[in-house]
């Protein structure tokens, strides 16, 4: 099966074929992110990492920015041709040196 593409992700957003997992919604609230900001990040972002299918399907990490320049990471997956937002967060040290670079693993 082919890797996810940013165009596939954007197509699902544009056609309202996406779901937000409970975990992603909890993390969104914890980081004070709106669904609109997450959408902005996905529509302007790029795929940073692809993850192997470990039994839950294909997934990838997208990095994008809000209109105000706030970085957001979104782990995206697939279920029945729908985009699943698995988790969302603001990348910060020590896990990330920058929005594009992993930091030291603690």
Regions inferred by a protein language model and the residue ranges of each:
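Ribonuclease/tRNase effector modules and their secretory precursors
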Residues: 1-106
